[in-house]
Amino acid sequence: MSDNKSVLVLKVGGALLQCEMGMSRLMTAAAQMIATGQKVLLVHGGGCLVDEQLTANGKETIKLDGLRVTPEDQIPIVVGALAGTSNKILQAAAAKAGLVSVGMSLGDGNTVHAKIKDERLGLVGEVSPNDATYLNFILDQGWLPICSSIAVSADGLMLNVNADQAATALAKLVNGNLVLLSDVSGVLDGKGQLIASLNKTEIETLVKQGVIEKGMKVKVEAALEVAQWMGKPVQVASWRDAEQLKKLVLGQSVGTQIQP
């Protein structure tokens, strides 16, 4: 594998898992990039599957400021849906595209430090980069790491981590280029038009106006944090058009660029 290209860190949400065509296009694009020597790391959530499993088990989905609250009695269901079902659905899609993938979680290889984020959120974790050895080994083989957002704390707690924040920590760890992919084309203004570029001041204004809210607020704030930390833009774009990803390899902008 070539070391002269930085790692492309792709974060995908749960909605992708319900779209066979979307997964197929994304994995095909990833395979094409890896074939050229581009290292690709996939980080995923799975909120839709978590909600389905909670409902099936008679549990309620609770959110606070766009972040999932994870009570102790829900953590086995959340871990199963994210580190289990969601992760393996993506591995199956990778296999169909001819990729060698490694299914993993934030708890593998001492990759991150994890702690409770906020007692009000229950078993929700906050993670920081720790050791890239395991990830780098996988990437150096030309394999695709597919990482769920489940972490393990030093005192043995299983923690549910917001997938955008998980992707941020891993992008920092491998000094990668982060792309937050969702089922919308990027950040939209009040009229539903795509905004090509945003900086911190513009983001704060749109949050105050209620244009950026809930899940997109979490996504944009995560993107801004990593953009500032790494001194380079982060992309917020759509997995619905995986062809766009090839533009990223060429250094072209897609979706909304969040500026440092």
Curated annotation (Swiss-Prot):
Record carries keyword Kinase: yes
Gene3D superfamilies in UniProt: Acetylglutamate kinase-like (3.40.1160.10)
GO CC term, one of those recorded: cytoplasm
E.C. designation(s): 2.7.2.8
Pfam family, one: AA_kinase
Site, as annotated: Transition state stabilizer: K11, K219
Localization per Swiss-Prot or TrEMBL: Cytoplasm
Superkingdom of source: Bacteria
Recorded catalytic activity of this chain's protein: N-acetyl-L-glutamate + ATP = N-acetyl-L-glutamyl 5-phosphate + ADP
One of the record's GO molecular function terms: acetylglutamate kinase activity
N-terminal signal peptide: none
Family matches, as InterPro entries: AceGlu_kinase-like_sf, AcgluKinase_fam, ArgB, Asp/Glu/Uridylate_kinase
PANTHER family: N-ACETYLGLUTAMATE SYNTHASE, N-ACETYLGLUTAMATE SYNTHASE, MITOCHONDRIAL
Protein name: Acetylglutamate kinase
Organism: Shewanella denitrificans (strain OS217 / ATCC BAA-1090 / DSM 15013)
